[in-house]
């Protein structure tokens, strides 16, 4: 198959639409179920590159959750502790495969943003992973293969309309890539820089110690940034992105956005949130929305009389700003990657509030000294990678 007609492009009025190969090769995919659209394929192909690189860099199964050509989450298949199983709503599923753990992490980090996601998996989709996907609102999945049991589960989703794409894991694109804007063709070499330990070797702070687990997490952050619209900043902890700040014109706004998402991830683990008693039969999305509001500044939207009764069995106490700050002060060992240099130390100040201890960024700002000095103030270890990772 050298081309595939699509229903429409980005919007319903943008017709005709198709994906195709410029050379004489066949498309490296097979659509096993559903009818993926233009944006689905953009998510799928960006996501597939991300998880393929995560697997190569870490040796672990990887998953990502994409929305509008940007990763809401990305993770490798480390085991889940009981708290994470609870906040990812998988505590009733028994032991999960490494690939299923990777998707539980990728989906669970920012569940609000992952609603209706497109999933990419580095490995053959197994029954555990398919069973997890079955429970979530999602548009589709791309993987190098599917077990018979997994495919049966996924084909039954959305009344048979769930998009399932098999990709040839041996496919490699041409070294030059092209895109058109306003009828004008742009050409560039593909971004094929390997993200490895060597990239993290130039540690410019007084603290030179970056443990192996932090190196793994920094590589996850940088690989995630390779496929995130710029400007972008990514917070990672324990093998998963916990906050992705994407597509902001201001670097510090990226850091604030990603930091707030990371804070929300950690706040969801607080006993005060874990102990919330929801009404029977509440939908997963409504539960996610209620938690997001409860831990935020608009908490009275779910605690006001006439509102809380629809969500909770027992009216929760207010989660005060002081209580939240005290809980967040316990967050440690977080890593941070940035797709370009930090122009001001305000980014470091904000990162510190979310438990960041390890940073990777290109360096090259005229204010590098001020940024390094701020890192030293908090005993952070920061590596200058010397490479920018813009994605447009």
Report residues per predicted region.
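Glycine- and Gly-Pro-enriched alpha-helical subdomains that act as flexible
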Residues: 72-112, 242-341
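Active-site loops and adjacent core secondary-structure elements that bind or stabilize anionic groups
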Residues: 1-199, 214-232
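Active-site-proximal loop/turn and secondary-structure-junction residues that shape catalytic pockets
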Residues: 70, 125, 237-240, 248, ...
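C-terminal binding/interaction regions
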Residues: 117, 121-122, 135-165, 170-172, ...
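Substrate-contacting helices/loops that form the catalytic groove of nucleic-acid
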Residues: 175-210, 268-288
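Bateman/CBS regulatory modules and CBS-like beta-alpha motifs in cytosolic regions of diverse proteins
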Residues: 124, 203-213, 342
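Conserved helix-loop functional segments at active or binding sites
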Residues: 53, 227, 264-268, 353, ...
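Flexible, glycine/charged-enriched surface loops at secondary-structure junctions
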Residues: 57-65, 164-167, 230-237, 267-278, ...
């Amino acid at each position: 198959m050298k081309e595939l007609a699509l229903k429409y492009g980005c919007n319903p009025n943008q017709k005709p639409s198709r994906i195709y190969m410029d050379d004489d090769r066949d498309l490296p995919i097979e659509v096993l179920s559903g009818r993926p659209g233009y944006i689905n394929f953009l998510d799928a192909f960006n996501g597939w590159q991300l998880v393929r690189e995560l697997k190569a860099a870490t040796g672990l199964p990887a998953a990502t959750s994409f929305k509008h050509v940007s990763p809401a989450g990305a993770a490798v298949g480390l085991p889940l502790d009981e708290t994470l199983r609870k906040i990812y709503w998988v505590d009733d599923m028994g032991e999960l495969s490494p690939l299923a753990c990777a998707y539980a992490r990728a989906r669970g980090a920012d569940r609000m943003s992952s609603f209706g996601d497109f999933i990419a998996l580095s490995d053959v989709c197994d029954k555990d992973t398919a069973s997890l996907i079955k429970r979530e609102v999602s548009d589709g999945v791309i993987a190098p293969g599917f077990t018979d049991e997994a495919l049966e589960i996924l084909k039954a989703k959305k009344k048979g309309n769930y998009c399932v794409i098999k990709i040839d894991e041996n496919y490699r694109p041409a070294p030059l890539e092209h895109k058109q804007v306003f009828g004008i063709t742009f050409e560039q070499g593909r971004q094929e820089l390997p993200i490895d330990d060597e990239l993290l070797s130039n540690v410019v702070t007084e603290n030179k110690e970056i443990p192996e687990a932090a190196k793994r997490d920094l590589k996850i952050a940088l690989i995630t940034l390779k496929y995130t619209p710029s400007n972008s900043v990514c917070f990672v902890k324990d093998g998963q992105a916990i906050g992705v700040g994407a597509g902001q014109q201001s670097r510090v706004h990226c850091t604030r956005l990603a930091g707030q998402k990371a804070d929300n991830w950690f706040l969801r683990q607080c006993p005060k949130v874990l102990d919330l008693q929801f009404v029977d039969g509440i939908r997963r999305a409504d539960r996610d929305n209620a938690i997001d509001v409860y831990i935020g500044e608009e908490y009275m939207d779910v605690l006001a009389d006439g509102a809380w009764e629809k969500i909770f069995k027992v009216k929760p106490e207010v989660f005060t700003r002081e209580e939240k700050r005290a809980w967040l002060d316990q967050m440690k060992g977080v890593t941070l990657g940035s797709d370009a240099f930090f122009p001001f130390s305000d980014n470091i100040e904000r990162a510190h509030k979310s438990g960041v201890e390890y940073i990777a960024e290109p360096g090259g700002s005229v204010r590098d000294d001020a940024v390094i000095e701020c890192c030293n103030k908090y005993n952070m270890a920061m590596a200058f990678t010397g490479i920018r990772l813009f994605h447009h």
